[in-house]
Amino acid sequence: MLRLLLLLLSTWMGSAAVRVPLRRVPSVRTQLRTQGLLEDFLKDNRPDMFNRRYAQCFPPGTPSLRLGRSSEKIYNFMDAQYYGEISLGNPPQNFSVIFDTGSADLWVPSSYCVSQACALHRRFKAFESNSFHHDGRTFGIHYGSGHLLGVMGRDTVKIGEMTTMNQEFGESVYEPGATFVTAKFDGVLGLAYQSLAEILGNPVFDNMMAQKMVDQPVFSFYLSRRTATSIPEGELLLGGIDEDLYTGPINWLPVSAKGYWQIKMESVAVQGVSSFCPRGCQAIVDTGTSLIGGPTNDMLSLQQLIGATPTNIGEVKHLRMKPNI
């Protein structure tokens, strides 16, 4: 199954486009299971991740997912990781990052971070970059089972053949919990609107447009399932669309709220039968997660239609046997 995500920003003329190969890695769940740590992790970590990440998408007073009502919707937030390479500083220091349309910040681990997660990943050495500018401000970002804290700075960011100057980013100095310990990526590069940012300053793609680095104000994702023939496993194209990777016309949708990439979804059906959202509802497109989330009553309706039952801990071992949504 191939999926193509196209996101349009605003009218712009630039000078280039760049391809970033993406790699798909085993989920955190799979890695913890292989190491025999999954059950302990699920027992010890019960974050209300949905409320933290998506609550602002819903009107005030809308019931959202409650803790323990659907644990898979909480713990599956990193079950599909597609990451690519960037570099920071001069001389360049390389990092693997998740290109995430569900957040707007760029951060990587700092050389001063003392958390276990940082010790297992590449860390930015600000003192080795002759183009680094220390900001002095601090930031905090919540991610499911924990959070990270850090300090802000500015430096040169290179993605493919594109170099963006004076990019604001974060150096994490504290990454508690197991969320990032088994992750194959080092940090996150957010592609959402600036209003979603925890770190002050423009997101990376906004700066690319401001510095006239891209031909078009468009970035597109190609994400493939892992198969013997899926080469590449994925690709991010900054500044354009690869027409060889899809067939038929593109269905362009207007952004209904600038923060997340929020759009109007017409309906949700299970095997052709409408389950909820019959007159349309708001949804967000998020490359940083694989969960389906929404108001409690709608999610309960969806779970009933596919034969799912709530559980506090455990694994979904028979997903392929469930009805298609």
Identify the residue ranges that each predicted region occupies.
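Active-site catalytic microenvironments in core metabolic enzymes, especially phosphate/sugar-handling
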Residues: 15, 302, 310
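Stable alpha-helical elements in mature extracytoplasmic
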Residues: 153, 200-204, 298, 302
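Signature of the N-terminal lobe/flap region of pepsin-like aspartyl proteases
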Residues: 61-184, 325
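Acidic glycine-/aspartate-rich tracts in secreted/extracellular proteins
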Residues: 112-114, 195, 244, 298
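Extended C-terminal subregions enriched in glycine
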Residues: 314-325
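Classical eukaryotic N-terminal signal peptides for Sec-dependent ER targeting/secretion
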Residues: 1-13
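Active-site beta-strand/loop microenvironment that shapes enzyme catalytic pockets
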Residues: 94-109, 273, 278-305
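Aspartyl protease catalytic domain
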Residues: 11-78, 122, 156-280
